[in-house]
C-alpha cells in the first residue's frame, strides 16, 4: 500500500547530499532494503526479541551509511527517520482498497508497531481498516509463520480463508507457507 521508495528516496538523496556523499541513492537504497531484511531475520532466527520496525530501519540505515562510508551525524539520521511518519500510498492503492472495502474485510498485517500503523492508516492511507494487526504482539517479524497463525486466530478464521496481498514476495511466501492464499501485486 505504501510507496517506501517513492516516499523515502528523495529524503535519502537529500541526506546523502547534506553529508557530501558521492554514492548513488539507488545503490544505497537497494543495499539498505537488503540490510533491513537481514536485521529482521536476525531478530527472528537468533530469537533476539522484537526490536521494533522503526528501530530496525534505523539500525539498518546506520549500518548501510557506515558501509558506504557516508559521514553523517546522529541529528541528520534523526531528521531523516521522521520521513517514516510521512509515507505516501501508491496512487492506485487507496482506490483499490476502497473498492474492496464493500466486499471483504480489510486487515492490515504489518511489521510496524501498532501505534505507527494506526498513524499511517488514519493520516497517510486514510482508509478505515477493519483490523490493524502488528507483529509486535507476536514478537517476530514476517515472514515467521507465527505472525500469520496469530492473525488467523485473532480474526477467528482458518488460514485458508485469508489472502495476503502484498508488493513484497517474502510476505506472500510466509503467508502461503502458513496456509493463506497470496497475491503479489
Regions inferred by a protein language model and the residue ranges of each:
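A short, structured active-site edge motif that brings together acidic residues
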Residues: 29, 33, 128-139
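Short acidic capping loops at alpha-helix termini that bridge into adjacent secondary structure
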Residues: 73, 127-131, 159-162
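N-terminal helical cap/lid subdomain that shapes the substrate entry/recognition surface
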Residues: 1-91
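Acidic, Mg2+-coordinating phosphoryl-transfer loop and its flanking beta/alpha structural elements
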Residues: 160-185
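Structural signature of beta-strand start/N-cap positions in the alpha/beta core
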Residues: 105-107, 130, 161, 181
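Short loop-to-alpha-helix "cap/lid" segments that border enzyme active sites
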Residues: 142-156, 173
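Conserved SAM-binding loop
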Residues: 109, 140, 164-165
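Substrate-recognition element of Asp-dependent hydrolases with the DxDx(T/V) motif
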Residues: 75-123, 132-135
Amino acid at each position: 500500500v505504501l510507496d517506501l521508495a517513492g516516499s523515502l528516496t528523495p529524503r535519502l538523496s537529500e541526506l546523502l547530499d547534506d553529508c557530501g556523499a558521492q554514492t548513488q541513492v539507488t545503490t544505497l537504497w537497494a543495499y539498505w532494503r537488503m540490510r533491513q531484511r537481514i536485521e529482521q531475520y536476525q531478530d527472528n532466527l537468533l530469537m533476539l526479541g522484537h526490536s521494533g520496525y522503526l528501530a530496525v530501519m534505523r539500525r539498518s540505515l546506520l549500518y548501510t551509511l557506515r558501509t558506504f562510508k557516508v559521514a553523517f551525524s546522529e541529528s541528520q539520521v534523526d531528521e531523516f527517520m521522521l520521513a517514516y511518519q510521512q509515507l505516501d500510498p501508491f496512487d492506485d492503492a487507496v482506490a483499490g482498497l476502497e473498492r474492496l472495502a464493500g466486499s471483504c474485510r480489510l486487515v492490515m498485517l504489518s511489521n510496524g508497531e501498532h501505534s505507527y500503523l494506526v498513524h499511517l492508516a488514519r493520516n497517510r492511507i486514510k482508509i478505515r481498516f477493519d483490523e490493524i494487526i502488528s507483529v509486535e504482539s507476536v514478537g517476530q517479524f514476517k515472514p515467521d509463520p507465527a505472525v500469520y497463525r496469530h492473525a488467523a486466530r485473532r480474526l477467528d478464521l482458518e488460514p485458508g480463508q485469508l489472502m495476503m496481498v502484498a508488493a513484497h514476495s517474502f510476505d506472500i511466501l510466509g503467508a502461503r507457507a502458513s496456509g493463506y492464499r497470496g497475491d503479489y501485486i
